[in-house]
Amino acid sequence: MPPPLASTTSSFASDGENYLGPVSATPHLMCERIVDAILPSSLPKGHHRRDERKKDIEVFDIGCNDARVLITACQKYKNVRGVGIEIDPVAANNARNNVRNSKLENRIEIREQDAMTVTDVHRAEYIFLYLLPKGNEKIEKILRERMNDRCRIVCYMFKLPDRLEDDKFWSKRLIKEVAFDDSRKRERKGVDTSRYNRIYVYGSKREMERREKIRKIVRAGVGVAIGIVLRNSMLK
């Protein structure tokens, strides 16, 4: 049985200063795709026994609704621990019940909390966001200030915005954008309104530094190769 869906309308005023968007659950098929995008495939799979030789991976879901993304991640990978932040009390209660029913209480923590007041986001190595553009605009400031150098972020549906045109902080970190024709496993024929649903993957600071080093090595290698070709052509 899939986890119950929380109400689609938040019980908090939509014009509040820290309002990030309505309560809305990620489709189950997209949960699987998001987990595959956010976590390395080298992690030990299965959720019954941890691999003591591997360190735990901290995943934060900001606006976690009924915790289905965190549950999917912990069920697929042994060494994943999750923290779900949810301001809506109904959704937070559903999340706790789903975590309990999945027997993952020792690995997933659900907080009924305003996401703008989270002070330990620096613990996260992976962060998932399914927020409206206005919500992404608000939360990105906190992520910039508090996330650690190893943190990778995955957004569903909407990108993280750059603050200024000449800033391009998030645009530079966008390493993957994947579009999916269907967000649900469909048992009946019908019109799918989710043809443009996308996942946006943002690399960590360390990832970007490694990529830049590789680019420099490749450029240097190409330069050397061109130099050799030119020199040989001149000797002929």
Where are these regions (language model features)?
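Conserved class I S-adenosyl-L-methionine
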Residues: D56-N65
